[in-house]
UniProtKB/Swiss-Prot annotation:
Location relative to the cell: Endoplasmic reticulum membrane
Segments of this protein annotated with the region Disordered: 163-194
Family classification: Belongs to the ALG6/ALG8 glucosyltransferase family.
Domain of life according to the entry: Eukaryota
Ranges that cross the membrane: 41-61, 132-152, 205-225, 234-254, 256-276, 314-334, 415-435, 453-473, 484-504, 509-529, 567-587, 595-615
GO cellular component annotations of the record: endoplasmic reticulum membrane
Keyword Transmembrane: yes
UniProt pathway: Protein modification; protein glycosylation
Enzyme Commission number(s): 2.4.1.265
GO MF annotation terms: dolichyl pyrophosphate Glc1Man9GlcNAc2 alpha-1,3-glucosyltransferase activity
Reported function: Dolichyl pyrophosphate Glc1Man9GlcNAc2 alpha-1,3-glucosyltransferase that operates in the biosynthetic pathway of dolichol-linked oligosaccharides, the glycan precursors employed in protein asparagine (N)-glycosylation. The assembly of dolichol-linked oligosaccharides begins on the cytosolic side of the endoplasmic reticulum membrane and finishes in its lumen. The sequential addition of sugars to dolichol pyrophosphate produces dolichol-linked oligosaccharides containing fourteen sugars, including two GlcNAcs, nine mannoses and three glucoses.
Gene: alg8
Name under which the protein is recorded: Dolichyl pyrophosphate Glc1Man9GlcNAc2 alpha-1,3-glucosyltransferase
GO biological process terms held by the UniProt record: dolichol-linked oligosaccharide biosynthetic process; protein N-linked glycosylation
Length: 625
């Protein structure tokens, strides 16, 4: 266990490793906010967000203004029936109460924004209020990110210190007659321990910076306009408490999150299995990562179990989770409106894919359906040659509406919500098995990423913005193993580029390019720098030759990208040139090709994201982390 160093020179360099427990939570907050470079990071990201305030106003800006008006003007019994605007309230009740809370402040800024009939209202004060509400609520995301990355750092250092102590003890036992050699070895080990500690601390700050500066959040929240950062803050805080062993607090926070935005059901399988195994069944974590889960043998003997199930833990967990859902949904059960609420939250009639196809498996499926129609290509395939396709169906093959009431697949089999659910469950099995088989918190975080990834790949009516649900938690795994650095770099670059169609106005093109290019360079340089430092530390520990050192230094300045991965990333540059310069000039005015830019972007990024998805299976099956 590493205690706080009173030396003022080290206050900004070494984070504090403290004991687990709920009482330490506020102390940990105080500790992470002591470091000057954390404050520099907060100032930097806040400045960027302020500079983005004049950005264009998307339809989501009006969506949230309308929700402010609905929740402030109407009783809760009418929230999910109000339809003056097409942008009806379709988030769970807790988010409605969040909008209600914001409306109390909005009233003093500009009360006109709270009038339901003021559709499209966007006064300067309204714009500033809504923009600042996102920036301020992001504080939870920033704080929770610093807490979790610092705690993971503590786990790694604590584990390494235990290993080094064991090695020192073995050396002392084996070399009792060589006192001078022992002293030299101990001094070298201490120096190497300090080098490793500084390296992990530097990487901890790098990972925090990469997550907090996430370009997806900047584009979606602070330009397009949503509150994803605030919700990600609740998610990370939930993971933080679960990893440190405060199971009930972590489960309550995740239940709260589900009642803010139901899309986080994508992660529910991983949370459910983790809580079931490590809190309700006779199973404990390794790596000393938790304090509340790991009990003494005497405590375990006193626990009341049936068929290996810890009954009291199961009851406590059930009461904690169900009480949150009762608070959220109880009023709607009482008013007999639960069916109306469900119809708003799960509008299956919207179709398989969004108008701009999310870059997933169904994008490729949709594309194949359209390609077969192009110039009657399907007639050359024996299975389809007798199909009769109406002319009006082939009028605009690049339109994005798929699987809705107005347009479905034409040649390939129609996909229903039941089919997407079945495929999703099948592909969830490996990640669930990984959590059940493992004894480490690392598998839990990877399970969250994999569960979200699977729903993103095969879910019904997935939005492209959901890619952020994968990149944010995956960032923390980069602290664990460099293999995740490569995966994160690829997924981050491809996934965040797939968000470009959200910022479609000409004025936003330089902004979106600058954000992604700057971030991609930051990630690449940060990862190769931390990899270089790690290799140098390993070289010192192993006393390798100078030739080996130089070779490893050369290798360290690379993420190990294969030639085809580099070629694919270069293709993104060519695709953006086509989208910005070629399509608007030569193809946009032709109805047949008016949406081809969106189609190509979706399909091209789908290929890369599917590749990253398969990469996660490799990590799971080979246990390479």
């Amino acid at each position: 266990m590493i205690k706080k160093n009173n030396n003022s020179n080290n206050n900004n360099n070494n984070p504090i490793i403290i004991k687990d427990g709920t009482n330490c939570f506020f102390k940990e907050i105080k500790d992470v906010l002591k470091f000057s470079r954390n404050w520099n990071l907060i100032i930097l990201v806040s400045t960027i967000k302020l500079l983005l305030i004049p950005s264009y106003l998307s339809t989501d800006f009006e969506v949230h203004r309308n929700w402010l008006a609905i929740t402030s003007s109407l009783p809760i019994s009418k929230w999910y029936f109000e339809n003056t605007s097409e942008w009806t309230l379709d988030y769970p009740p807790f988010f409605g109460w969040f909008e209600y809370f914001l409306s109390k402040f909005a009233y003093y800024i500009d009360s006109e924004m709270l009038v339901i009939d003021n559709l499209g209202y966007k006064s300067t004060s309204t714009i500033l209020f809504q923009r600042f509400s996102v920036i301020i609520s992001d504080s939870l995301f920033i704080l929770s990110t610093l807490l979790l990355s610092n705690y993971i750092y503590n786990i790694i250092i604590k584990k390494n210190n235990n290993k080094n102590n064991n090695n020192n003890n073995n050396n002392n036992n084996n070399n009792n007659n060589n006192n001078n050699n022992n002293n030299n070895n101990n001094n070298n080990n201490n120096n190497n321990n300090n080098n490793n500690l500084h390296w992990y601390h530097d990487k901890s700050f790098i990972i925090s910076s990469i997550i907090i500066l996430n370009p997806g959040l900047l584009m979606v929240d602070h330009i397009h306009f949503q509150y994803n950062g605030f919700l990600k803050g609740i998610l990370i805080l939930s993971i933080y408490f679960l990893v440190r062993g405060n199971i009930l607090i972590g489960s309550i926070l995740f239940s709260v999150l589900l009642n803010f935005k139901h899309i986080y059901m994508y992660m529910a399988p991983a949370f459910f299995v983790y809580l079931l195994k490590y809190y309700c069944l006779k199973s404990n974590l390794n790596d000393n990562t938790t304090s509340k889960v790991n009990h003494s043998k005497q405590q375990q003997q006193q626990e009341f179990t049936i068929f290996g199930i810890k009954i009291f833990n199961l009851i406590k967990l059930g009461i904690s989770v169900l009480s949150i859902f009762l608070i959220s949904l109880g009023p709607f059960f009482y008013m007999g409106q639960i069916q109306q609420l469900i119809s708003r939250l799960f509008p299956f009639g919207r179709g398989l894919s969004h108008a701009y196809w999310a870059p997933n498996f169904w994008s490729i499926y949709n594309f194949l359906d359209r390609v077969l129609l192009f110039n009657g290509l399907y007639k050359k395939i024996p299975f389809f040659k007798n199909f009769i396709i109406p002319d009006q169906v082939t009028g605009n093959l690049t339109s994005g509406l798929v699987g809705s009431e107005t347009q479905s697949h034409i040649l390939l089999p129609k996909i229903t919500p039941q089919i997407t659910l079945l495929i999703t469950i099948l592909f969830l099995i490996p990640s669930i098995y990984s959590i059940l088989k493992s004894k480490s918190w690392k598998h839990f975080i990877l399970g969250i990423c994999q569960s979200s990834f699977t729903f993103f790949m095969f879910g019904w009516h997935v939005h492209e913005k959901a890619i952020i649900m994968i990149t944010i938690p995956m960032g923390f795994l980069c602290l664990v193993n460099n293999k995740f650095s490569k995966l994160y770099f690829l997924l981050s670059t491809i996934g965040h580029y797939s968000l470009f169609p959200l910022l479609f106005q000409v004025e936003e093109i330089p902004t979106r390019i600058l954000i992604l290019v700057t971030y991609t360079l930051l990630v690449y340089l940060s990862f190769i720098s931390s990899s270089s430092n790690n290799n140098n530390n390993n070289n010192n520990n192993n006393n390798n030759s100078n030739n080996n050192n130089s070779k490893q230094r050369k290798c360290s300045f690379s993420l190990g990208l294969y030639w085809f991965e580099k070629f694919y990333l270069f293709g993104i540059i060519l695709l953006e040139i086509f989208n910005v310069f070629i399509h608007p000039v030569f193809l946009a005015h032709i109805e047949r090709f008016s949406f081809i830019s969106l189609m190509i972007t979706s399909v091209y990024t789908s290929v890369g994201i599917i590749y990253c998805y398969l990469f996660t299976f490799k990590l799971i099956f080979k246990n390479e982390y």
